């Protein structure tokens, strides 16, 4: 597939997602990183967004709940270039009813080459990177070329 680039802005669009057993862990991480997070635009699946907003006072645009389609809503935003990075504390030891949606969300994040943290250590690495508050050019699929090849 041919590639093109897009520029992530200085103020990133960050998706925050957590499975039920990991919501307390994400909440703790968000509280620890609140000062950095408030410089960015935050999105979340419904239940996670409601919890984080209520407990931290951060402005978060919440989708609907993940199992009801929120994972897919975030995936659509990623494919439109409207999400720059994702912090997704998922539960690798317990199946969830919407496992196919979870896999699709992680797949689409990989397709569109956005940074994804699936645990606290990786989230800390991302948030301690100087790139967090800089414009960053990333390679992404050239959808126009892809379309031209297929039609």
Curated annotation (Swiss-Prot):
This is Methylglyoxal synthase. Its EC number is 4.2.3.3. Disulfide bonds: none annotated. The active site is at 71 (proton donor/acceptor). The gene is mgsA. Belongs to the methylglyoxal synthase family. PANTHER family: METHYLGLYOXAL SYNTHASE. Keywords: Lyase. GO terms for molecular function: methylglyoxal synthase activity. Coiled coil: none annotated. GO terms for cellular component: cytosol. It holds the Pfam family MGS. Catalyzes the formation of methylglyoxal from dihydroxyacetone phosphate. It catalyses: dihydroxyacetone phosphate = methylglyoxal + phosphate. Residues 6-151 form the MGS-like domain. It comes from the Bacteria. Substrate binds at residues 19, 23, 45-48, 65-66, 98. It comes from Vibrio atlanticus (strain LGP32). GO terms for biological process: methylglyoxal biosynthetic process. The keyword Lyase applies. The lineage of its organism: Bacteria, Pseudomonadati, Pseudomonadota, Gammaproteobacteria, Vibrionales.
